[in-house]
């Protein structure tokens, strides 16, 4: 079938799409853009004028095409926590991800994880030092935007560099599907995820708090620790404002 008779690829619908960005990263013609819906969730959209109908976006979509990459059978399960109490306190849970990430950095590898940027825009960043790793620590309960991170990761892997990618399971699956082969120098670490809201929801909440306290919010911690090992029953979050500093977000002041 010649190119003129080929059909525009059909991406998965909103009910299946996880905004993994595999299709967005694989398109060499930049014919796919990520569009935010009314809930602030991202979904891919094809520009018919730029699309050459190669079908690569369909091939790498983990919801449309099942692959057998990285199938290791039944997983082995371990329970652990970081012995260093200072670093453990700065992590949401036991600090296992920080320990693994630190080991990768000591081997001159690259660590990718979710971090807040300007206006608390959540995206994947690369950390190559322990200082840069601090931005990746702690949970962020909103959808992280991948942007073109997968392309950079592929270049690093093809150069033989060690890479650790940490993120939600759907983004890990999207990365591996985008790569289309297993890399011995790639490590991935996902987490138990119950679904995340779009950044538009969090943006509205941020605007609400800034109006309520008449101050600019600089960072937000959904599950802060009262001590190094946390405390059972702590149901509050912590917002840090430019002038007012830390303010607890409890039921009576949310």
Task: Describe these PLM feature segments.
Residues 65-254:
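Iron-sulfur-associated redox domains of electron-transfer enzymes in respiratory
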Residues 49-50:
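Short, charged amphipathic alpha-helical surface segments
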């Amino acid at each position: 079938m010649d190119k003129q008779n080929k059909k525009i690829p059909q991406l998965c619908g909103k009910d299946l799409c996880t905004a993994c960005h595999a299709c967005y990263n694989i398109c060499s013609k930049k014919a796919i853009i990520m569009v935010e819906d009314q809930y602030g969730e991202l979904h891919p959209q094809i520009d018919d004028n730029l699309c050459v109908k190669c079908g690569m976006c369909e091939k790498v979509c983990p919801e449309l095409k099942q692959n057998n990459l990285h199938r290791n059978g039944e997983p082995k399960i371990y329970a652990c926590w970081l012995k260093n109490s200072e670093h453990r306190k700065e992590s949401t849970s036991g600090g296992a991800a920080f320990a693994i990430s630190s080991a990768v950095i000591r081997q001159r590898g690259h660590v990718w994880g979710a971090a807040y940027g300007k206006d608390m825009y959540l995206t994947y960043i690369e950390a190559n030092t322990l200082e840069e790793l601090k931005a990746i620590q702690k949970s962020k309960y909103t959808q992280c935007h991948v942007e073109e991170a997968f392309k950079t990761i592929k270049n690093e892997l093809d150069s033989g560099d060690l890479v650790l990618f940490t993120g939600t399971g759907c983004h890990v699956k999207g990365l591996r599907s985008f790569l289309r082969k297993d890399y011995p120098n790639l490590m991935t670490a996902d987490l138990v995820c119950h679904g995340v809201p779009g950044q538009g929801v969090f943006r509205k909440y941020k605007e609400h708090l800034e109006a309520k306290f008449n101050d600019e919010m600089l960072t937000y911690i959904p599950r802060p620790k009262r001590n190094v090992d946390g405390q059972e029953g702590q149901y509050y979050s912590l917002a840090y404002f430019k002038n007012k500093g830390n303010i607890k977000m409890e039921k009576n002041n949310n």
